[in-house]
Amino acid sequence: TKELTEFIGGCGAGRVYAAIEPEGTVTPCVFLPYPVGNLRIKSFWDIWMDPFMENFRNRDRLKGFCGKCPYKLICGGCRARAYNYFGDVLAPDPGCIYNSAEWRKLQEDILRIKVKVSPLAFK
């Protein structure tokens, strides 16, 4: 059904699953090391209901292209990738084919950054 596709479709981080680290820290995803809480201090339910986790369940909060995309309820983009590139889990997913303009901008930004590397680093 459409409802099931929209629920299961795309990334399940913070919507269908969460990651639990060995010491009890809960993150929305293994690729998003943002600690939301710790099971030694709070219940899983309280962590799951944290406002930060709600960002993953409410796709109407998505920004940029992902927020306007007709597939946002089926896809939703990778929230970890958005966070790692922009520092915001609600930002557009730069890896999405429908978001190619943003991807080109990121590539241009990377080319403008000049990194000095010591030749000793490769010996």
Predicted features by range, described:
Residues 60-106:
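Cysteine-cluster motifs in flexible loop/terminal segments that predominantly coordinate metals
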Residues 112:
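Ligand-binding grooves and catalytic loops that recognize ribose/phosphate and carbohydrate rings
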Residues 76, 115-123:
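Short flanking/linker segments adjacent to small metal-binding domains or redox-active Cys/His motifs
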Residues 11-15:
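Short, small/polar residue-rich loop motifs at catalytic or cofactor-binding pockets
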Residues 1-2, 25-76:
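C-terminal accessory region of radical SAM enzymes
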Residues 20-21:
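Short, acidic, Ser/Thr-enriched surface-loop or helix-capping motifs
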